[in-house]
Curated annotation (Swiss-Prot):
Induction: By abscisic acid (ABA).
The family this protein is said to belong to: Belongs to the peroxiredoxin family. Prx6 subfamily.
Domain (Thioredoxin) ranges: 4-164
PANTHER family with a match to the protein in the record: MCG48959-RELATED, PEROXIREDOXIN-6
InterPro entries with a match to the protein in the record: AhpC/TSA, Peroxiredoxin_AhpC-typ, Peroxiredoxin_C, PRX_1cys, Thioredoxin-like_sf, Thioredoxin_domain
Keyword Nucleus carried by entry: yes
Catalysed reaction, written as an equation: a hydroperoxide + [thioredoxin]-dithiol = an alcohol + [thioredoxin]-disulfide + H2O
Matches recorded under CDD domains: PRX_1cys
Name listed for the protein in its UniProt record: 1-Cys peroxiredoxin PER1
Motif residue range(s): Bipartite nuclear localization signal: 194-217
Miscellaneous comment: The active site is a conserved redox-active cysteine residue, the peroxidatic cysteine (C(P)), which makes the nucleophilic attack on the peroxide substrate. The peroxide oxidizes the C(P)-SH to cysteine sulfenic acid (C(P)-SOH), which then reacts with another cysteine residue, the resolving cysteine (C(R)), to form a disulfide bridge. The disulfide is subsequently reduced by an appropriate electron donor to complete the catalytic cycle. In this 1-Cys peroxiredoxin, no C(R) is present and C(P) instead forms a disulfide with a cysteine from another protein or with a small thiol molecule.
Function (record text): Thiol-specific peroxidase that catalyzes the reduction of hydrogen peroxide and organic hydroperoxides to water and alcohols, respectively. Seems to contribute to the inhibition of germination during stress.
């Protein structure tokens, strides 16, 4: 069966964490959560990633988005490793919880397993990141191999896109950033678009003359 992906409800797992017991649905509450895995504590790329998450925590907080990490190491390991993360990026504080999944059952349910990375206990997590909405449904997923660290600017951009799309019923084009034009969904007629977007919209003049590429500001 395919693993957890966009449109699926995230499992309501309860795990130990650096902040005590966490039940995922309770943690999500009525907001958005970035649920992300890392292959292992005390490893180089993971240290830079979780430090970057700490640096960007305020950006996510401003958007009403919480962070929640997970790996197969135990809670005590997470706590000890946090000292290294904060020393690597002075001034950064790891304020978000990191869950422990020593038996690796949670990462399987969350579709966070890297089939190519293993240790003596079994398969390790990939660098997976799910953005979970208030309805507990996965809205977006990133999946990176162990050799490639994630780009936090792109994670922020993706969050901004999801929040904008949800609020204004639009979509965002390639390389979009907040303040730039968005596109109107194909299922919205021109008449509906005039009511939805009284500020107006522009239709790209394309060879097909189909009028499907419409831009507006929100």
């Amino acid at each position: 069966m395919p693993g957890l992906t966009i449109g699926d409800t995230v499992p309501n797992l309860e795990l130990d964490s650096t902040h005590g017991k966490i039940r995922i649905h309770d943690y999500v509450g009525n907001g958005y959560v970035i649920l992300f895995s890392h292959p292992g504590d005390f490893t180089p790329v993971c240290t830079t990633e979780l430090a970057a998450m700490a640096n960007y925590a305020k950006e996510f907080e401003k958007r009403g988005v919480k962070l929640l990490g997970i790996s197969c190491d135990d809670v005590q390991s997470h706590k000890e490793w946090t000292k290294d993360i904060e020393a690597y990026k002075p001034g950064s504080k790891v304020t978000y919880p990191i869950m422990a999944d020593p038996d690796r059952s949670a990462i399987k349910q969350l579709n966070m397993v890297d089939p190519d990375e293993k240790d003596a206990q079994g398969q390790l997590p990939s660098r997976t990141l799910h953005i979970v909405g208030p309805d507990k449904v996965v809205k977006l997923s990133f999946l990176y191999p162990s050799c490639t660290g994630r780009n936090m600017d792109e994670v922020v951009r993706a969050v901004d896109s999801l929040l904008t799309a949800a609020k204004h019923k639009v979509a965002t084009p390639a390389n979009w950033k907040p303040g730039e034009c968005v596109v109107i969904a194909p299922g919205v007629s021109d008449e509906e678009a005039k009511k939805m977007f009284p500020q107006g919209f522009e239709t790209a003049d394309l060879p097909s003359k189909k009028g499907y590429l419409r831009f507006t500001k929100v």
